[in-house]
Amino acid sequence: MAAGLITGSILFWTLRLGIGPTPTSRKVRAAIRDILPDNVSGHVMELGCGWGHLIPTLREKYPDKKIEVWERSPVPALFTEARYGIDVIRADFFKAAPGNAGLIVCYLYPGAMDRVERELIPQLPPGCWLLTHTFSLSNRVPVKTLRANDLYQTPVFLYQVQPA
């Protein structure tokens, strides 16, 4: 019974959000670790943290930074809170005020990446970093691109917001 409810919840939120809570593989996490910027001026936000697999990498790289994670699907959010001892914001991050963010990390489907570009990036301060993997931003050129050493050579993209 419980397994059915858990599966049903994950399926519901996958259909609603357009992407399931897919764990980031070890090899993609290694590429992310290698491309993360050393200097981040504000706090770190992970949009759509899923099962929380990037949290240890972000905590290790930025031990003095506030790390804010967002996930709307309840089952992965509860797992992440229990496993990593972090409060997960269970809200629509497109309604967030990321004003003093120094780094945004996200793995979202292409339609959501378009919304990030259209709605979220204009709110970010100049110099803020944006890291994505698998799916790039359509209208921006990354500062750096790295390919994971996995079967798919998964691309990891690093962007930086420029002054208007």
Where are these regions (language model features)?
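S-adenosyl-L-methionine
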Residues: M1-N39
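Conserved class I S-adenosyl-L-methionine
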Residues: V40-G50
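Glycine-rich SAM-binding Motif I of class I
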Residues: G52-P56
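Conserved SAM-binding motif I beta-strand of class I
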Residues: K66-E71
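Conserved SAM-binding loop
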Residues: T80
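Conserved SAM-binding strand-loop segment of SAM-dependent methyltransferases
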Residues: Y84-F93
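A short SAM/SAH-binding and catalytic strip from SAM-dependent methyltransferases
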Residues: A101-R115
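C-terminal substrate-binding/active-site "lid" region of AdoMet-derived donor-dependent transferases
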Residues: A112-A164
